[in-house]
Amino acid sequence: MKTAHTIVVFGGDYCGPEVMKEGLKVLSEIERQNPDVKLELIHHLVGGAAWDVHGENITTAALSDATSASAVLLGAVGGPKWAKHAIPVEWGLGRLRKALDAFGNLRPVNFAAPSLISRSSLKPKVCTGTEILIVRELTGGVYFGPRSEHDGSFDQASDTDVYTRKEIERVTRLAGSLAMARDPPLAVTSLDKANVLAACGRLWRGVVSEVMAAEFPEIELRHMLIDSAAMVMALNPTKLNGVVLASNMFGDIISDQASAIPGSIGLLPSASLCSIPERGQESSRIRGLYEPIHGSAPDIAGKGIVNPIGMILSVAMMCRLSLDMGAAATSIEAAVRDTLEVGICTPDIGGTASTSEVGDAVVAALVRIFDKH
């Protein structure tokens, strides 16, 4: 009997459908190589595309399908066409994350191929060997705390940073479980501002310390102030190798800073997870939302030059974390590496290949890898 997985696909806006097409090419080849697996794709609209058709940024039917699926794939959301809407179309993504209860965002920071080291914003001697997994808490903190807008006078406004023990415990367990999936376990560096802040400072540090000591004593835990971490990320990022754990706002900022290291924002995948993988397991079956970290890129959408690697590597993350197909994920990563190493890449990283040519090359590399085995 075949193992069945349902995947909800949101192409999204502008360049989103372009990169999604390449991600699905790769996924189709993975299904071909695994005859005991059946992948059912359900397509829905989100963001501006959903607004144009349905008059809302995401439909109830789409949310229902997503919350019962094995995983969700997303291209990109939003753009200038809908910039003046009273309700931002990007809120569709927020509604999707909330419906899924996606609480932990994962962003790997590394080089998909050795040849990319020369494309980094950092000197090769500084960035070579960077291997970081940023785990960002998504449900609490200043983005969701009570706020007071100014009254039009621009005199005063406020945002309140609120965290609960439960929120911090959950994301700490996620970071610990991901660290334990490697042998030996990865170090965990927790970022905070414990010298001046209460919520994402002293509370954060205290709860993280308790959980790690009680549940993950094998793991080396390091605490670092967020401003110090930002400096280290720019000067010597390998000092942060392992899992970097951060609150919502700090994780938002440090992950964007880190995205400059691999050479192009188009290279980087992400996952937003809804539960915690089993301790010490390299692959799992937990629901997650997978998307490249780049935006909808309206300036280059439709030109056939958008980098699809972030989307393709997001598919690899989905295979590993939601479909329990770790070997397939490893094959995708190897195919991406092989493709980039022979110079087949988009203009953002110095190549001349189109979006579809890169996708086709990754699929061809996947076929070669499969045939070798």
Curated annotation (Swiss-Prot):
Family recorded in the similarity comment: Belongs to the isocitrate and isopropylmalate dehydrogenases family.
Subunit details: Homodimer.
Gene Ontology MF: a single term: NAD binding
Protein name (database record): 3-isopropylmalate dehydrogenase AMT6
EC assignment: 1.1.1.85
GO biological process: L-leucine biosynthetic process
PROSITE patterns the UniProt entry points to: IDH_IMDH
EC top class, as a word: oxidoreductase
Positions of Mg(2+) binding: D227, D252, D256
Site for Critical for catalysis, residues: Y143, K193
UniProt source species: Alternaria alternata (Alternaria rot fungus)
